[in-house]
Amino acid sequence: MHISIVGITGYTGLELLRLALNHPHVTVSSIHATKEVGVQISDIFPHLKGIFDKEIQVFDSEFIMTHSDLVFFATPSGVAKDLSKNFVKNNFPVIDLSGDHRLSPDVYLKWYKKSPCTVDIQKRFTYGLSEVMNISHRNRFIANPGCYATATELALYPIISNHLIRVDSIIVDAKSGLTGAGKKLNQSSHYVNVNNNYVTYKLNKHQHIPEIVQTLQFFNKSLQNIQFSTSLIPVNRGIVATIYTRLENGVKINQIESTYKDVYKNKPFIRIKDGLPQLNEVIGTNYTDIGFVYNETTGVLTISSVIDNLIKGAAGQAIQNMNLMFNFDETDGLILAPLYI
């Protein structure tokens, strides 16, 4: 199949290209951006020289629909909702890696502070949490989940949907590598401010909060909200979500373990660890590693979920959704050993 990537010069666009080039069934037909149009991508990013040398093209939806079978949007928020309209009108498959189609329009406006897509268009998009939402060939439009949301939702879904924890007790402390802040320079991601430092940002205001709540409420209506903090740590890649919660009355810790293993037993990209996971065990992969510890003294269940924010938190999950949409094996192009060192 042939694909096009819009937003090729960002971290996510480049990672999407890297994964697509190694996919057994994919040819990258065109790449698009607002800058460097007409320039070979390998002249901007020399690591691609001799591997992929296509020119960056101006965005043209008609050209993409003529030459490709699917378009990926790896664009900043506020872009895809406008550029995708013609694709939706023509029922042409779209995977949007931005937040533009994840939330209802009123919630999007509140948290993103940008004009939303219409209700009709938003409802045509399926939220692409691959292991949970049963993505298939019936889905034409995918709203790929956010990175923090992916790590948090996959950690909580089994025990929230089975009503094993108190939903009024959830605290999430999430930490991300610097690529999670995007390429645009700002004070929170400036090298001098982040190196040898720990920076908390968007406390109680991160745009993935309503996404997480919306998704988890679908499986447990009792959930009203969560306490969620986000911080940057001085690594390039990765997310660690540490979650604190309490068990429902009568629930035993062995039920937690058996539920995780049962829910995810046929999910190739989720690994339930005997102990707590480490970030370097998932970097460079599409895996989500989940571990937990129960403190009998305090009655607190601590869950740790780790992912590579650029792969499972973005480009890898997008490829996984593509595989499911086009009836490929779910793991095609995604069997990647961790970088580890």
From Swiss-Prot:
The keyword Amino-acid biosynthesis applies. It comes from Staphylococcus epidermidis (strain ATCC 35984 / DSM 28319 / BCRC 17069 / CCUG 31568 / BM 3577 / RP62A). This is N-acetyl-gamma-glutamyl-phosphate reductase. It is found in: Cytoplasm. GO terms for biological process: L-arginine biosynthetic process. The lineage of its organism: Bacteria, Bacillati, Bacillota, Bacilli, Bacillales. It holds the Pfam family Semialdhyde_dhC_1. Pathway: Amino-acid biosynthesis; L-arginine biosynthesis; N(2)-acetyl-L-ornithine from L-glutamate: step 3/4. HAMAP family: ArgC_type1 (MF_00150). Belongs to the NAGSA dehydrogenase family. Type 1 subfamily.
